[in-house]
């Protein structure tokens, strides 16, 4: 989202995510036009503005699309994201080492995973955890935190089965 905001010259963006927490902990992350999250004192200004909202009007999705309030983001943003990340990395002096990658049921497979593959990194995706699923069915305690060894158990198993020495994981919202 941070890249898309800048690429589309948007005023900001919103992610609804439990991040690396259990599914019941969904929350909102607001991003400013520069692509970063709101920080003090702007975060308080945003919170105060949200607190003043008395009601939220709803409309059918199709109507939102037909009125221009909702628009699909083209594949070009994804292509630009990959190109920008590849351009920021110097080619390695030696071949990349193979890696097992897990997005822990989140969106990182189409961001981090695609960038790794485009860079030429030999990537083996952890298959069960590459399927987006906000219930996090394969993660102990339903807490997909890549800093938790238990969350990476399946990826480690995949690495051992494939003779790979490196495991990489991202939290579900890939931030």
Language-model features and meaning:
Residues 11-14, 29, 123-124, 165-167, ...:
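Structural motif
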Residues 26-159:
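Gly/Ser/Thr-enriched, mixed-charge loops and adjacent short helices
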Residues 1-34:
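Ferredoxin-reductase
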Residues 42, 164-165:
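Generic detector of short, well-ordered, non-transmembrane alpha-helical segments enriched
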Residues 8-9, 159-164:
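Glycine-rich phosphate-binding loop signature in dinucleotide/nucleotide-binding domains
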Residues 2-5, 17, 89, 155-156, ...:
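A generic local secondary-structure boundary/capping motif
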């Amino acid at each position: 989202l941070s890249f898309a905001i800048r690429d589309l010259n948007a005023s900001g963006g919103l992610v609804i995510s439990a991040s690396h927490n259990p599914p019941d902990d969904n929350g909102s992350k607001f991003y400013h036009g520069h692509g970063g999250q709101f920080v003090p004192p702007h975060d308080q200004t945003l919170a105060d503005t949200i607190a003043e909202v008395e009601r939220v009007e709803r409309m059918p999705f199709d109507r939102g699309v037909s009125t221009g309030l909702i628009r699909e983001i083209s594949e070009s943003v994804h292509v630009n994201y990959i190109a920008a990340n590849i351009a920021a990395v110097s080619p390695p002096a030696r071949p990349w080492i193979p890696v097992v990658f897990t997005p822990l049921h989140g969106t990182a497979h189409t961001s981090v995973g695609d960038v790794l593959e485009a860079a030429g990194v030999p990537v083996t995706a952890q298959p069960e955890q590459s399927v987006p699923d906000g219930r996090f069915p394969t993660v102990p305690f339903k807490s997909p935190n890549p800093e938790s060894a238990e969350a990476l158990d399946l990826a480690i198993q995949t690495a051992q089965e494939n003779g790979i020495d490196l495991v990489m994981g991202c939290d579900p919202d890939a931030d």
